[in-house]
Design a protein with these regions (language model features):
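Alpha-helical repeat scaffolds
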Residues: 1-3, 29-43, 65-81, 105-139, ...
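Small-side-chain structural scaffolding
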Residues: 4-5, 12-14, 162, 168
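Short coil/turn linkers that connect adjacent helices within long alpha-helical scaffolds
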Residues: 5, 42, 141-143, 182-184
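Amphipathic alpha-helical repeat scaffolds of TPR domains
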Residues: 7-21, 45-61, 79-117, 145-156
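Short, low-complexity intrinsically disordered segments
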Residues: 13, 117, 130-133, 182, ...
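Tryptophan-centered motif/residue detector
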Residues: 15, 38, 63, 182-187
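Structural motif corresponding to the intra-repeat A-B loop/turn of tetratricopeptide repeats
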Residues: 25-28, 64, 98, 162
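Extended, charged low-complexity segments
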Residues: 145, 149-150, 154-205
């Protein structure tokens, strides 16, 4: 990765790859080293969703951080994102990560850790509305670029489970039938989940 970074000095991809690989080390990497890699990435592409996502995973409780550290990073990134940037959806990625960690740790898949309210508590609902406002509202072009599919699926999944049809319906219409495997697979069979919510909200092609 470092050789690629030297060969392609303006390309953020090698730095994204370095951060992705860093979380696979049993003890992670030194904070200063991660910070240097992040500075290199951020300087080349300050609004890279994939780059931010790799850091978010690194900071998650599943890897080398905590839920608090992960959410702080996601909300800080969302807070400085320009209107129309997809970075606010990092908060929905963080909520999925928290759910996965809690579900794996729970002996009783719902009652022991309150997973039934994970998607629809006040904080989760507010987060969905905030991402919707900052990212989607105001878009004049409702076409979906291939690189946006996964991010839109994360927001649609969150809106569905939060019980926000005013957000979920337009998102499902934008997606049409282009459901991605994740995050739907974390709450059931992905195809069945995507189809179920389209039917529940009466979204037609």
């Amino acid at each position: 990765c470092l050789q690629a970074a030297e060969a392609f000095v303006d390309d953020p991809t090698p730095w994204i790859s370095l951060i992705s690989v860093a979380r696979l080390y049993p003890a992670g990497v030194r904070r200063q080293e991660l910070g240097r890699w992040w500075d290199e990435l951020h300087g080349r592409d300050p609004y890279s969703v994939e780059g931010h996502l790799q850091v978010l995973h690194y900071y998650s409780a599943r890897w080398h951080g905590s839920n608090g550290l992960m959410y702080d990073f996601a909300r800080d990134a969302a807070g400085v994102a320009p209107p129309g940037s997809a970075l606010p959806v990092l908060v929905q990625y963080a909520r999925v990560e928290e759910y996965r960690t809690a579900k794996d740790a729970a002996e009783d898949r719902r009652t022991s850790v309150g997973l039934g309210q994970h998607w629809k508590n006040d904080g989760a609902v507010s987060d969905v509305r905030r991402t919707w406002q900052r990212w989607i509202v105001g878009r004049t072009d409702h076409s979906v670029a291939p690189g946006e599919l996964r991010d839109l699926n994360y927001l649609a999944h969150a809106a569905c489970h939060a019980g926000l049809p005013e957000v979920a319906v337009p998102l499902l219409r934008m997606l049409d039938r282009r459901g991605t495997r994740t995050p739907w697979s974390y709450t059931g069979d992905p195809e069945q989940q995507f189809t179920k919510w389209r039917k529940e909200f009466r979204v037609r092609a």
